[in-house]
Amino acid sequence: MKFNGKLQLHTFLRIAICLLVGICIGDATADAVPVALWRWLFVGLLSLLVLLHLSKRLEMMQTLLIFCVVMAGGAWRITSYENSLRCAFTGEEEVYEAVVVSQPIKKRRSMKCELAVVSGRLAGHRLNAYFQNPNSLNRIVVGDGIKAQSVFSGFDDTYAQRGGFDWRRQRMVRGIVARTFVASDKWKRAEVSLEAMPRIDRLALSLQSLRYDLLSRLQGSALSEDSYATIAAMTLGDKTGVSAELRDTYSKAGVSHVLALSGLHLGIIYAMIALLLGRRRNTMGGLLVTLLLVWTFALMVGMSPGIVRSAAMFSVYASMTFLQRDYLTANSLALAASVMLLASPAMLWDVGFQMSFLAVMGIVICHVLLRNNRFYVRYAHRRFVGKLVSLVCISLAAQLFVLPLVMYYFGNVPFYFLLANIVAVPLTTFIIYAAMLLFVLSPLCRFAAWMTVVWQWLASGVGWVVAQMNTLLKVIASLPGASAEGVYISALQLSLMYVLIVALVGVWRYGQQMYDSMHGKFKSEDDLKKLRIKSKRVKE
């Protein structure tokens, strides 16, 4: 079975596009086309593909069939997933056992948390639970089992929603099928069996309990509320303590990604792992340790789409480095997307998934164009200026591809994002390294009193840095014209903006190639290296 032309260079990219199209078709026809039809279509097309491959004929037809098989498989996966979430509600109280899988959030009159039902009619599903009398729930933490009796109901999505944000889609991504209000006398803590939960979910639950312990130790230090909330969000993905004011500050400054675990945070942790392993990172043992630590961290912080994408990308990168093969960024990104969508096709509509992949795609496409010019190469070898120029290029590339989505979902356009990123990214790197050191030293405080003093001193220092960063971001967010709010766009405008971006990037790339051919500019990485060496010699 052969791929022809440029298909060999971007195999997974084309497959990912076909999978995405298939998922969209399956979702649009979910009510009209049964799951069985998509299943049999997938089996039939796959059988035909195998027959053509064995006969070694019609290679172009084989390529076309591969794409059709992928599309049919995507439609099959999404329709099966959506059917599994459909539940009927009786309107009567039901007895069930469940386990707490998200950090409880205190509301005005209740406490909200996410439950995974392990026994009862909705066993295997998740639901949003609202507990009466929140003051009595201080002891409820992630991993606790409960036995309750309440009425399950659907969600009311008739209220107006600004922008393109769809709460129904977001619940579908998380597998939440119902909501329930639990009276104070209708539940109790209980030892529940987790056999109904998949093994990966049980492992994630155990690691999230460890995450809660780390958060408790951090909360016990003398940190301000905003400092604690910022560190918890940056390191362990817990945003429950982030106030509306702090969230608004980061949004207006254009650095909301700092509070959401993504490639930036996992990249810092990956660099830390590589530094600790040293030369052994390129061995089989080093590769296994790296993959184990990366995915353990991803499970511990909740497996959000952004962190899963980052973990998959760094896994591919580590594997390619070990095999000493070229690291094809576009193919690796497409491979990560395909694996994630096959595992959970509804993730396609997750806002974090979309923004994460588009940001990386922007970096993949535009950062290469930005760095392939003499200005970048002239300063790339300089330690401080080179890193600053690289940071600006990455921020511009990511913002270009993410901005239309931000306008579509949130109606916010930050104008000082470059300045904010120059401030936030280096400080975030320091904060994550220091926070990880805090987590490692925390257990040692039980054995030596002087270690407690050192730990508190270090925590105070980290808290001071976080406070200064938050202050600087507040100043940036308060500058005149820092952001434009209420700039919502429609789905059609969103599509047209991305068409325009792709067209501009194409023209930019074509113009750069024409300029290179006319002026004899460098075209290869070897030429870039020669120019860097020449720049160093001239400077010396």
Question: Residue locations for each model-derived region?
Answer:
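Alpha-helical transmembrane segments of multi-pass integral membrane proteins
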Residues: 361-481
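Hydrophobic alpha-helical transmembrane segments in multi-pass membrane proteins
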Residues: 14, 22, 57-64, 180, ...
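Short helical patches
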Residues: 3, 196-216, 370, 444-447, ...
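Hydrophobic alpha-helical transmembrane segments
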Residues: 10-16, 202-204, 208, 235-240, ...
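Membrane-interface helix/helix-cap signal primarily in integral membrane proteins
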Residues: 2-5, 58, 62-257, 485-486
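Proline-centered turn/helix-capping motifs that create local helix->coil transitions or kinks
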Residues: 222-226, 305, 328, 371, ...
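Membrane-embedded alpha-helical segments of integral membrane proteins
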Residues: 7-53, 463-467, 471-505
